[in-house]
């Protein structure tokens, strides 16, 4: 059994705690528990009497979080699952409504640093990228079984990679001589596909393709859309939803979802009053995303791309 190091610095920690508006004795959910960096600080502020539900689909993360939160075990519930199912998991855990929810989207430090998970283009390892290792389908399955058109679509749409078609073409050609099953083999293909001049622009040439594959393997964008809606449904009026994203695709989904639930009216603009009956569910707290300050950027380079958005439940109407 491989032991992973889950010690990491939680991003935007003080901003997260502030926007959750934590209350002693309150009920809260960390839908992306990870190594419990955020959760360890949340639970300190809600005891005595408070309850924290932590959810993660990574069993190694759950094991690490249990150890980290051992001192608060009477106030913590830990569940294995995908945060898209946050409503059902909360209700199964005895939490019908909660005072706040945190979703910290993206790959955690330990997943990037451990080559056995296949998330990183900086370490050689199996081309996996599954957040939940119970799933049968991984990144190598996509590359070795999908059509050139489908691979192009994934890399273009999820990675926003302008060389997507060329990379896909090289992948199809390479797999004729053998299965593409390691991260460094994919990195080599990407480097050969992207012209030399373009490889010197915008960081590591494999960054966008690896992001695209990770999103596709874990169905991340659809999961996020469902999670925002399901999380909102179990918030008490006045409860806070805080979401941290790490790339523009995720941030746009959160921004759009928040705006749609703040202004759900579908009446024609020429009508003097609303007749559709759709009530706002949320009030957006952060008109612009909160980003890391200079001090955090120096201490934790992975906070550079982090964006935090927060909203408050305003309606008691349930679906």
Predicted regions and their residues:
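S-adenosyl-L-methionine-dependent methyltransferase catalytic core, i.e., the SAM/SAH-binding region
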Residues: 1-319
